[in-house]
């Protein structure tokens, strides 16, 4: 089983930390995990030309490199901080530009999927950003999963919050987010193994 974790933050701080927790847990379970940073790829905004209705995107940039990695993975996690209650611009470019994968016979179908979100504020729109990613996954015929461990010590999916009771903190201090990241890794492996035949057919 191979996990691709996509860091949709322009920085390598809180979102990356949670992705690293997930990747390390997946490796401990005997599987492969890779983290990529969207900021290292040139993915321009969608032009709305609809070339992808008949074939590949008309813009020849790094979207092809990222989609290739996504297609090679059994499971995909997209991590994003919340920017005004939604995903970052570079994540939205990935979402829009990967339309050709959907139009090209659902090339990402049956990949296990989960969102990871970080937010500056406790009520900073993390759940809305996560839902945007889940809707994207459903549109690509992926298989979104949630955490199935103790709902008191974990969330439905990892949400790291920088705003603490005593002021600002690092997500590294958010125990619920860390517990959730570890639990999500286990769930991803479980579902990926159970659905392996779907990706091989």
Curated annotation (Swiss-Prot):
Cofactor(s) the protein requires to work: FMN; [4Fe-4S] cluster
What keywords tag this UniProt record?
4Fe-4S, Flavoprotein, FMN, Iron, Iron-sulfur, Metal-binding
An MF annotation (GO) of this entry: 4 iron, 4 sulfur cluster binding
Cofactor binding note from Swiss-Prot or TrEMBL: Binds 1 FMN per subunit. Binds 1 [4Fe-4S] cluster per subunit.
Q: Tell me one Pfam family matched here.
A: FMN_red
Positions annotated to bind [4Fe-4S] cluster: 46, 49, 52, 57
- Self-association state and partner proteins as the record states: Homodimer.
Similarity annotation? Belongs to the SsuE family. Isf subfamily.
Q: Fetch the PANTHER family from UniProt.
A: IRON-SULFUR FLAVOPROTEIN MJ1083, NAD(P)H-DEPENDENT FMN-CONTAINING OXIDOREDUCTASE YWQN-RELATED
Q: What is this protein called?
A: Iron-sulfur flavoprotein AF_1896
Organism, scientific name = Archaeoglobus fulgidus (strain ATCC 49558 / DSM 4304 / JCM 9628 / NBRC 100126 / VC-16)
């Amino acid at each position: 089983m191979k996990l691709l974790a996509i860091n949709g933050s322009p920085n390598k701080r809180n979102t990356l930390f949670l992705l690293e927790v997930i990747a390390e847990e997946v490796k401990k379970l005997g599987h492969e995990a890779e983290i990529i940073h969207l900021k290292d790829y040139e993915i321009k905004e969608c032009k709305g030309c609809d070339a992808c209705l008949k074939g590949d995107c008309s813009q020849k940039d790094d979207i092809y490199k990222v989609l290739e990695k996504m297609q090679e993975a059994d499971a995909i996690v997209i991590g994003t901080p919340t920017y005004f209650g939604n995903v970052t611009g570079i994540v939205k470019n990935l979402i829009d530009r990967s339309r050709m994968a959907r139009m090209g016979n659902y090339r990402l179908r049956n990949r296990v999927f989960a969102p990871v979100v970080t937010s500056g504020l406790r009520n900073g729109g993390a759940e809305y950003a996560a839902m945007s990613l889940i809707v994207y996954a459903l549109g690509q015929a992926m298989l979104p999963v949630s955490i199935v461990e103790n709902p008191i010590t974990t969330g439905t999916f990892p949400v790291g919050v920088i705003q603490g009771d005593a002021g600002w903190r690092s997500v590294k201090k958010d125990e619920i987010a860390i517990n959730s990241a570890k639990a999500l890794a286990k769930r991803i492996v479980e579902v990926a193994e159970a659905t392996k035949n779907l990706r091989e057919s």
